[in-house]
Amino acid sequence: MERYGGAGEDESRSDPSHEWSAQGTETGIEASMWRLGLRGGGGGGETFPERPDEPDCIYYLRTGVCGYGSRCRFNHPRNRAPVLGGLRTEAGEFPERMGQPVCQHFMRTGTCKFGASCKYHHPRQGGGGDSVTPVSLNYMGFPLRPGEKECSYFMRTGQCKFGSTCRYHHPVPPGVQAPSQQQQQQLSAGPTMYPSLQSQTVPSSQQYGVVLARPQLLPGSYVQSPYGYGQMVLPPGMVPYSGWNPYQASVSAMPSPGTQPSMGTSSVYGITPLSPSAPAYQSGPSSTGVSNKEQTFPQRPEQPECQYFMRTGDCKFGTSCRFHHPMEAASPEASTLSHIGLPLRPGAVPCTHFAQHGICKFGPACKFDHSLGSSSLSYSPSPSSLTDMPVAPYPSSLGTLAPSSSSDQCTELISSSSIEPITTTTGGSETVAAGVSSMTSDVSHPEPAETNKGDSASNEAKTSS
C-alpha cells in the first residue's frame, strides 16, 4: 500500500530505516535530524520535494520544515515569499489561495474555524470581505436570511446552537412582538428593585413605607400591607382567596396603586372578604387570557393543526411549536367552575376520567362536563348518620353487653343445656341479647364438680371390696 510518496519514485517507497542502518558513519542523532529535515545544517530546501500539481504543504508554508521530508506527497515551493504574501495574518482575516477551491463555509457564514491553516481560497469579496453587508440579527441574536430556508431547529425550540454563523433563516415567530430598544436596555442592565410609584395618602406618623415592585415588564398584584406600611406587590397566584382547590385558576391583576383605597377603608390584604353564603371563587371568561394566547401561540395556516391545542386550548411548546393554533379554539365558551376548580358544562359530554377517579389532569382547560352527579365518588356520609350505629366490643358468640357507667349495674346470666336469652338490667332498662351455650353453665355452677367427687368415691369402694 502506497502511503506517503507518489508513484514512480523509488526513494518514496523505500523504508528509510534500511538506509540509516547501511550508513555506518551516521549515528542515531544524525538519523533523527534527517527525519526532521535538519540534515546538512538546515538546508531543507533540497530535501522537500516540489510537486507543482499537488496542493501546498500547509505545515511547510507556516514553519519552513516538513517532518515527512522527501516522502511528503504535497508541494514544497523553494520560495515561500509569494505564497506567504497571500496569507493575511490580521485578526479576522483568512488566507487567499488563488487556484484552490473556494471555502464554502466562509462564503456562507463569513468565518472559517480553520483560520490561516485552511487550504481553501477565501476571496476578499466573499463572506469575510468588507464590501459585503453584514447579516442582520433578530432580537434573540440569530441571523435573518430572508432568501434562505428556515432553520428547523430554531422553529421547534426557539434556539440555535450555531448562533450567528447559522446559514439558515431565523424569522421572528408570528404573534410575538420584539421588545423595544428601551426594554432591551432595561433587561440587559437588570431590573430596578425599587422603582418610583405614585404618592399615596398615608398618615404623617407612617412616613417610612416599604414598597416592593416587579420590573415593568412583569405585571403584579397590588395589595395592602398587613403591617400598615403602604402597598406591596405579590406575584400572580399568591393573592389569597377564601377557598382552596387543587387546580390553579388565573388570577387577574388588581388595580394600579393610584386607584387603591386608603388604608383605613380596606381589609388587611386589600380584598373585600366574602360572606359565608357566597361561593368560594367566582370565575368567568377573561379577555386577558385570550389575548395572551393570541400573542403566545403562533398561527401557521399552512401547517397542520396542533391536536393538543385543539383539545385543551393550551400548548406546552409555546411560540416554538411548528403547528397551527387557530384562535377560535383558544377562546373557550363561558363556563363556571365547581368548588374543586373544574369547569361545569351542562350541555357537554361528561368527563370519563373525572367520573371514575374524581380528578381531571386537564383542570379548568378540560372541554368536558365535571358535574358532581357524573362522578361515582360523590357519596359522603354525614357525621350525624354515624352516631346511632351500635358498636359490639365482644364477639357475637359470647353475647352483647350494653355499655354502662352506673355503679348499680346488675348482670344475670341464665344458662341451661339449651341456648337461652340473657337479660341485662341497667338502671331500669333491659336489653335482650343472644344466649350462651352450655359451656357457660359449666363455669357458672360448681355442682357438676361435686358429682364427679361422689362418683370417684364409689369407684374406690368397689375396688377395695
Swiss-Prot record:
Composition bias, Polar residues: 283-298, 454-465
SMART domains: ZnF_C3H1
Residues passing through the membrane, by range: none
Basic and acidic residues bias: start-end ranges: 444-453
C3H1-type zinc finger locations on the chain: 51-79, 97-125, 145-173, 300-328, 345-373
Name of protein: Zinc finger CCCH domain-containing protein 58
Keyword Electron transport: no
Organism name: Arabidopsis thaliana
Keyword Zinc recorded: yes
GO cellular component assignments: nucleus
